[in-house]
Amino acid sequence: MNIFKILFILNYALIFLIKIYQNTLSKIFGLQCIYKPTCSKYSIECLKKYNFLTALILMTLRIIRCNALFKGGNDFTPKYKPILESLKEFKKRLIK
Protein backbone atom coordinates (compact mmCIF):
# COMPACT_ATOMS: atom_id res chain seq x y z
CA MET A 1 0.00 0.00 0.00
CA ASN A 2 1.49 3.37 -0.91
CA ILE A 3 1.81 6.34 1.43
CA PHE A 4 -1.00 8.31 -0.24
CA LYS A 5 -3.53 5.56 0.42
CA ILE A 6 -2.39 5.32 4.03
CA LEU A 7 -2.77 9.09 4.54
CA PHE A 8 -6.18 9.01 2.83
CA ILE A 9 -7.31 6.25 5.18
CA LEU A 10 -5.94 8.18 8.18
CA ASN A 11 -7.91 11.27 7.12
CA TYR A 12 -11.19 9.40 7.03
CA ALA A 13 -10.44 7.40 10.19
CA LEU A 14 -9.86 10.67 12.04
CA ILE A 15 -13.06 12.16 10.59
CA PHE A 16 -14.92 9.09 11.87
CA LEU A 17 -13.45 9.54 15.38
CA ILE A 18 -14.31 13.25 15.40
CA LYS A 19 -17.91 12.46 14.42
CA ILE A 20 -18.10 9.98 17.31
CA TYR A 21 -16.82 12.75 19.62
CA GLN A 22 -19.41 15.20 18.22
CA ASN A 23 -22.24 12.76 18.87
CA THR A 24 -21.14 11.70 22.37
CA LEU A 25 -18.69 13.73 24.47
CA SER A 26 -19.48 17.05 22.83
CA LYS A 27 -23.14 16.69 23.80
CA ILE A 28 -22.22 15.75 27.37
CA PHE A 29 -19.87 18.70 27.96
CA GLY A 30 -21.87 21.23 25.96
CA LEU A 31 -20.60 23.80 23.51
CA GLN A 32 -17.34 25.11 24.94
CA CYS A 33 -15.62 26.26 21.74
CA ILE A 34 -14.99 30.00 21.37
CA TYR A 35 -14.87 29.77 17.58
CA LYS A 36 -17.31 29.43 14.71
CA PRO A 37 -17.20 26.82 13.26
CA THR A 38 -16.41 24.70 16.29
CA CYS A 39 -12.99 23.08 16.56
CA SER A 40 -14.39 19.67 15.62
CA LYS A 41 -16.12 21.05 12.50
CA TYR A 42 -12.96 22.97 11.62
CA SER A 43 -10.95 19.75 11.97
CA ILE A 44 -13.26 17.86 9.63
CA GLU A 45 -13.04 20.68 7.07
CA CYS A 46 -9.23 20.59 7.26
CA LEU A 47 -9.14 16.82 6.85
CA LYS A 48 -11.39 17.01 3.78
CA LYS A 49 -9.51 19.92 2.23
CA TYR A 50 -5.83 19.18 2.99
CA ASN A 51 -3.52 16.21 3.31
CA PHE A 52 -3.25 14.48 6.67
CA LEU A 53 -0.08 16.21 7.89
CA THR A 54 -1.22 19.73 6.95
CA ALA A 55 -4.63 19.08 8.51
CA LEU A 56 -3.00 17.76 11.68
CA ILE A 57 -0.89 20.92 12.04
CA LEU A 58 -3.92 23.18 11.41
CA MET A 59 -6.06 21.23 13.88
CA THR A 60 -3.36 21.36 16.55
CA LEU A 61 -2.89 25.12 16.16
CA ARG A 62 -6.65 25.65 16.35
CA ILE A 63 -7.11 23.51 19.46
CA ILE A 64 -4.21 25.32 21.18
CA ARG A 65 -5.98 28.64 20.39
CA CYS A 66 -9.32 27.50 21.81
CA ASN A 67 -9.00 28.97 25.30
CA ALA A 68 -9.35 32.21 27.26
CA LEU A 69 -5.94 33.53 26.15
CA PHE A 70 -7.21 34.02 22.60
CA LYS A 71 -10.03 36.03 21.04
CA GLY A 72 -12.80 33.85 19.64
CA GLY A 73 -15.12 34.52 16.73
CA ASN A 74 -15.26 33.40 13.13
CA ASP A 75 -12.23 31.36 12.10
CA PHE A 76 -12.59 29.40 8.89
CA THR A 77 -10.13 27.05 7.23
CA PRO A 78 -7.44 29.02 5.40
CA LYS A 79 -7.63 29.02 1.60
CA TYR A 80 -4.02 29.82 0.66
CA LYS A 81 -0.80 28.81 2.44
CA PRO A 82 -2.81 27.19 5.24
CA ILE A 83 -0.05 26.73 7.83
CA LEU A 84 1.31 30.26 7.38
CA GLU A 85 -2.21 31.74 7.60
CA SER A 86 -2.97 29.70 10.71
CA LEU A 87 0.22 30.92 12.39
CA LYS A 88 -0.71 34.53 11.54
CA GLU A 89 -4.16 33.93 13.05
CA PHE A 90 -2.48 32.49 16.15
CA LYS A 91 -0.47 35.70 16.64
CA LYS A 92 -3.36 38.02 15.74
CA ARG A 93 -5.85 36.49 18.20
CA LEU A 94 -3.51 36.25 21.21
CA ILE A 95 -4.75 38.53 24.00
CA LYS A 96 -1.85 40.66 25.20
Curated annotation (Swiss-Prot):
One GO location term (cellular component): plasma membrane
Pfam families: YidD
Disulfide bonds: none
Major location (coarse): membrane
SMART domains: Haemolytic (SM01234)
Topology relative to the membrane: Peripheral membrane protein
InterPro entries: Membr_insert_effic_factor_YidD
Keyword entries, A-Z: Cell inner membrane, Cell membrane, Membrane
Domain of life: Bacteria
Subcellular location, record wording: Cell inner membrane
Family: Belongs to the UPF0161 family.
Listed PANTHER family: MEMBRANE PROTEIN INSERTION EFFICIENCY FACTOR-RELATED
NCBIfam families: membrane protein insertion efficiency factor YidD
Biological function: Could be involved in insertion of integral membrane proteins into the membrane.
Protein name per the record: Putative membrane protein insertion efficiency factor
